[in-house]
Amino acid sequence: MAQTLYDKLWNTHVVHTEDDGTALLYIDRQLLHEVTSPQAFEGLNVAHRPVWRISANLAVSDHNVPTTDRSHGIADPVSKLQVDTLDANCDAFGITQFKMNDVRQGIVHIIGPEQGATLPGMTIVCGDSHTSTHGAFGALAHGIGTSEVEHVLATQTLLQKKSKNMLVKVEGALPRGCTAKDIVLAIIGRIGTAGGTGYAIEFGGSTIRALTMEGRMTVCNMAIEAGARAGMVAVDDTTIDYLKGRPFVPTGAEWDQAVEYWREFKSDEGAQFDRVVELNAAEIVPQVTWGTSPEMVTSIDGRVPDPEREKDPVKRDAMERALAYMALEPNTPMESIKVDKIFIGSCTNARIEDIRAAAYVVKKLNRRIASNVRLAMVVPGSGLVKAQAEREGLDKVFTDAGFEWREPGCSMCLAMNADRLDPGERCASTSNRNFEGRQGAGGRTHLVSPAMAAAAAIEGHFVDIRQLG
């Protein structure tokens, strides 16, 4: 019987299934960070339990680490406690960890793939919503809660119910100026933030296959914003080429065996999906969110929608509340919206490809950031991304234009440390969530691609990067 990619991943990891469909799944890799792991380790200590499979875990501090000068440590006592606690727990249990001043440190969903700890055919979990990122490698990856983090540490298994299968198929050549971020925002705009609820989404089609691994990770990263449990892309040569030679990846004869196995992780011809959504890439244009949910998105050449045109009273009310929070008027051209701050970073868009795309725009415009922009910051996703960008001279492109070049971490994505918006400030952000207060109490977030964020920094307002040539 033909199987989907999700079926294969599920079936190869089921240990036991109850009559009600609840299954015990084996977990191949758990990624840990400082925010959702302390209580899990404390649970092990109280119960005098060991970590079941130490080598299956990889840890890093990312949420609370400062992105400015780290020579003086962490100023906030709560943040410092969480980071120090992760250090102590990993030392005590023998878990591999990239500590704050390790060049390999970075955002957990960037360092996993970067190190080759994320591999095709794996089940991967982390106490973080955007674990779906790792599905780009043909893996089943999703976020879990702290009690589940403890359960995986203790047993290397997890209780789950199987999701339904959804295929999001994007065909055609992506227009100039459009990126993976625009693809996934367009998908969410189409199906809504509840469109994927109860599903695992496979992203397929010629447009997805043409993306780099960085682009595929961006798309899978935001599967959770469409309501899906997980997002994934089938394994192909692009996947294999990315992985070869990375630290955690098999070598020699084991590499050859692994590649042969990995290539099985694609949907069989004739496999049945519970829902299929199709998009034409030629119709995608650079996207900008206007509201307080990722589904509140439109094209850069569009206007802020008018709630009066929405027939559904519930949606109309949500639109009105969003516009009030965002201080926007219906029918305002998106290109006329001015911004106060720029954030280029996060587990969605802080890889080397993203940094290059933003730097290209800054270099092309050849001007400093606009006078109304109070802060424009670039936060690389890892120490290795930062080092690569500096070898290419990208840091100087940014600093010469008035941007701040920071140390790796989650940063303004969720208003950590001093990296936040003040009340009423408007931000062009390459992150994944534009909820009320997400980047700081009273802050207003617009989600865009790195190129769009860079252009907004220079111009002081959103612009259509397709016009830059």
From Swiss-Prot:
Record-linked Gene3D superfamilies: Aconitase, domain 3
One of the GO BP terms on file: L-leucine biosynthetic process
Enzyme Commission number(s): 4.2.1.33
GO MF terms, alphabetically ordered: 3-isopropylmalate dehydratase activity; 4 iron, 4 sulfur cluster binding; metal ion binding
Pfam families reported for this sequence: Aconitase
Signal peptide: none
Swiss-Prot/TrEMBL catalytic activity: (2R,3S)-3-isopropylmalate = (2S)-2-isopropylmalate
Binding site for [4Fe-4S] cluster: 347, 410, 413
Coiled-coil blocks: none
Pathway membership: Amino-acid biosynthesis; L-leucine biosynthesis; L-leucine from 3-methyl-2-oxobutanoate: step 2/4
Known cofactor(s): [4Fe-4S] cluster
SUPFAM superfamilies, A to Z: Aconitase iron-sulfur domain
The keyword Methyltransferase appears for this protein: no
Cofactor note: Binds 1 [4Fe-4S] cluster per subunit.
Record PROSITE patterns: ACONITASE_1, ACONITASE_2
Assembly description: Heterodimer of LeuC and LeuD.
Family: Belongs to the aconitase/IPM isomerase family. LeuC type 1 subfamily.
The protein, known as: 3-isopropylmalate dehydratase large subunit
